Every structure is written in structure tokens, then in C-alpha cells.
């Protein structure tokens, strides 16, 4: 019997927190269940994982489990009075100080961002829907002009395609989540924002410390990771192209 090489990975979240729904996913061809650790607590994820395993074992289906790490991402923080609307041409400030957000400024999660950007840098917010251009940096404040405006709500992602940001490859949360993966017998780790082979090796070392042979999928989400993959096969035998974040930073034709 020929087995198809293309596999179907389904993300299990609150929308499928029913045994009947998981059973339908498995019966219609799901090969791997992805658990996104950018969201939810360990207690929530464990309840979902146990439900999945119970259904999988009842059906006797060979469906793998993937823990997708949050990784070293940058986000805006919260707006005090809910979403705001940014207009093209207006000024807007990103700050590394912890302040209530409003229509003129908002805090960011990365404490050193003001040290790593400068005038002319593009800053893309909310998967590129909002585009800012840095005009100047004063202290902890990054003064920008809005080049592409629109509605903006709390906790949206930030991408900076023109600068290599010096974020750590593994956060404290990632380390806790990797331990969770070991304790609960996950088959794969999808390692977010891998930029170098060393990023993969650091995860491998941590897993080795726990005597785990969980396999690693290197997720390429920015141009640096893509270029490193071209130079260094040590980035891993398994690669996932995260078209959301990658698509924000480079053209789809590339």
C-alpha cells in the first residue's frame, strides 16, 4: 500500500475541545496534532492533550504530537481603553517603559528595542497590517510615523525586517514548555524563530539533559533563518516554513 508523503498537521485549540471533533479530524486524515504554546496554560494544554490521546488510542491511529514553542517574539503590550485606530501620517511612539497604551504610544515586550533600531527602520505590527517608520529614538522612546494605518488592539506581533534583533534563542517560558513536552511524551518540538544551527543545538542539549529523544523541527520565520539554512545543514533535518511571520518580512515570490 502506498502511503502519501504529504502529511496533514492540525492545530488543536479551544475550537476543537470536544472528543467528537478530534475523532473527526483523525478519521479524515490528520497525521499530527499541533499544540500551540504561544497560548494557553499548561493545565489547559494538558487537558487537551489527554483528551486527544484518549481518542487516538481508542481509534488505534498513529497520529503524532507536536509542541510548538512560543519562541523569542516581540509584541506590543496593552491599550488601557481598548483598541485604537492609527491614521496614515500621524506620529506614534513605541516605548520600552511600562506605560498604559493609548492612541499616541504603547509599550513593547522587548526591553532593548530602543537600542537596536534607528531612523529609517520599518516596524511592522499585527502581521504587517500596520507599518511604522522610525523617525528618531529618544531615551526609551521610539518615535515613528504611521505609513500604513488601521485598527490596532493589544498584544499584537512586531516584525522588524531591516534589523537583526538580538533576542535570546530560548526564553524561560520555552524551557518550561520543553520540560512539559518531555514529561508528556511529545513526538516533535516545533522550535519557533530558529536563526542558526546553534539555536537547534541548544534545544537538543536541553532535551538530552532530560534523556529525551524528541525530534526537533526548525521553524524558519525570518530572513536570517532562511539564509542560515542555506549555509548550514546543521539547522536540522526537519524544517517548517512559518509563512505568516516569514511572509511579513520578505516577498512571497522570494
Where are these predicted regions, by residue range?
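Non-catalytic helical/linker scaffolds that mediate oligomerization, partner binding
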Residues: 1-254
Amino acid at each position: 500500500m502506498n502511503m502519501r508523503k504529504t502529511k496533514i498537521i492540525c492545530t488543536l485549540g479551544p475550537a476543537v475541545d470536544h472528543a467528537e471533533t478530534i475523532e473527526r479530524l483523525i478519521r479524515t486524515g490528520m497525521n499530527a496534532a499541533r499544540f500551540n504554546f504561544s497560548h494557553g496554560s499548561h493545565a489547559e494544554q494538558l487537558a487537551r492533550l489527554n483528551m486527544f490521546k484518549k481518542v487516538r488510542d481508542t481509534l488505534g491511529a498513529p497520529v503524532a504530537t507536536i509542541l510548538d514553542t512560543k519562541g523569542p517574539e516581540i509584541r506590543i503590550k496593552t491599550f488601557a481603553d481598548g483598541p485604537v485606530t492609527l491614521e496614515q501620517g500621524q506620529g506614534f511612539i513605541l516605548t520600552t517603559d511600562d506605560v498604559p497604551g493609548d492612541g499616541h504610544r504603547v509599550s513593547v515586550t522587548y526591553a532593548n528595542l530602543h537600542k537596536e533600531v534607528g531612523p529609517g527602520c520599518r516596524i511592522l505590527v499585527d502581521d504587517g497590517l500596520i507599518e511604522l517608520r522610525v523617525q528618531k529614538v529618544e531615551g526609551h522612546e521610539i518615535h515613528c510615523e504611521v505609513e500604513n494605518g488601521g485598527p490596532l488592539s493589544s498584544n499584537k506581533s512586531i516584525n522588524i525586517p531591516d534589523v537583526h534583533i538580538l533576542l535570546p534563542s530560548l526564553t524561560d517560558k520555552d524551557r518550561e514548555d520543553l520540560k512539559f513536552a518531555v514529561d508528556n511524551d511529545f513526538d516533535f518540538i516545533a522550535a519557533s524563530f530558529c536563526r542558526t544551527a546553534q539555536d537547534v543545538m541548544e534545544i537538543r542539549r536541553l532535551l538530552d539533559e532530560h534523556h529525551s529523544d524528541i525530534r526537533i523541527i526548525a521553524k524558519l520565520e525570518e530572513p536570517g533563518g532562511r539564509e542560515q539554512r542555506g549555509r548550514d545543514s546543521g539547522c536540522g533535518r526537519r524544517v517548517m516554513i512559518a509563512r505568516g511571520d516569514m511572509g511579513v518580512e520578505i516577498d512571497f515570490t522570494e
